[in-house]
From Swiss-Prot:
Monomer. Its EC number is 2.5.1.75. Pfam families: IPPT (PF01715). This is tRNA dimethylallyltransferase. It catalyses: adenosine(37) in tRNA + dimethylallyl diphosphate = N(6)-dimethylallyladenosine(37) in tRNA + diphosphate.
Length: 305
């Protein structure tokens, strides 16, 4: 059985992945799979910068709006569902294109991730259960920053599991999870979009301003009123920062500035993950040659396969 070619577009938030993916899909007869851990959730639209039907421009998209925020969508589930989507697109005679910024999820598709077969240490786990989730996440960040960049602070169960695996095996959870041999069913081309840090941060600030103009506060308030504030999906950047505002503990401007700050930090962690964990062909974003360079690399890859 021949390998399935897959184009993968990665990079930090607000760098321009979505628009590039649409252009490549048009020119290469592709369909797009979202590689974003947040865009799978219905109702989380503005805060996740979810692509709109207009922006899709007729290109079929997968793994967007497939579940409710109260229903966890894990990396293991993403691996299974994305592989199904790849097969569906390939069997239809089209090119699968994955686009997103969730490194752990995307990497799990192409490498045979082990999602935790190490045995448990119930005594150690019980000790960790007594600690505050912030303290636990800080422990993880100190011991294994790569895992901390991918596991949300509010996902206490996952943080504890990562610490438990390190306690039992003596090596970082991020190293334990991944098998560095590519799954032989796929032949991926990883294209990464990079941008000058100052320009990227300015884009992020502008994107957050636009989110507020488009109704982010209303979207977050709806989630708040549905008592979903402790659901991991809703604790993502863009929502959790507004909850103190709803409770009268911060101003709206403070909430906006915090979203911008957290988004910038997240972009930095994304870049660290992609540069350290994946073999990526980087392209300069935000210049006139971005699209043509990406298209040339993709065409060369597809011709040579």
């Amino acid at each position: 059985m021949s390998k399935i070619p897959v184009i993968v577009i990665v990079g930090p938030t607000a760098v321009g992945k979505t628009s590039l993916s649409i252009e490549l899909a048009k020119k290469l007869d592709g369909e797009i799979i979202s590689g974003d851990s947040m865009q799978v959730y219905r109702g989380l639209d503005i805060g996740t910068a979810k692509i709109t039907p207009e922006e899709m421009d007729g290109i079929k998209h997968y793994l967007i709006d497939v579940t409710n925020p109260s229903e966890p969508f894990t990396a293991a589930k993403f691996q299974i569902e994305t592989r199904k989507c790849i097969e569906t697109i390939h069997q239809a005679g089209r090119l699968p294109i994955i686009v997103g910024g969730t490194g752990l999820y995307i990497q799990s598709v192409f490498y045979d991730y082990d999602f935790g077969n190490v045995s448990e240490d119930k005594a150690y786990r019980a000790e960790l259960e007594q600690l505050d989730k912030t303290v636990l996440w800080q422990m993880l960040e100190q011991k294994d920053p790569e895992s901390a960049a991918q596991i949300h602070e509010n996902n206490k169960r996952r943080v504890i599991r990562a610490l438990e695996v390190m306690h039992l095996t003596g090596k970082p959870f991020s190293e334990y999870q991944v098998n560095n041999v590519l799954n032989d069913r796929y032949q991926p081309l990883f294209l990464g979009l990079d941008l000058d840090r100052a320009l990227l941060y300015e884009r992020i600030n502008q994107r957050v301003n636009l989110m507020f103009e488009e109704g982010l506060v209303t979207e977050a308030k709806k989630l708040y009123e549905q008592h979903l504030v402790d659901v991991p999906a809703v604790r993502g950047i863009g929502y959790k920062e507004l909850f103190p505002y709803f409770e009268g503990k911060s101003s709206l401007e403070e909430a906006k500035e915090l979203i911008q700050k957290n988004s910038r930090h997240f972009a930095k962690r994304q870049l660290t993950w992609f540069r350290n964990r994946m073999d990526i062909d980087w392209i300069q974003a935000g210049v006139s040659s971005t699209e043509s360079e990406a298209l040339n690399k993709a065409t060369t890859f597809l011709t040579a396969k």
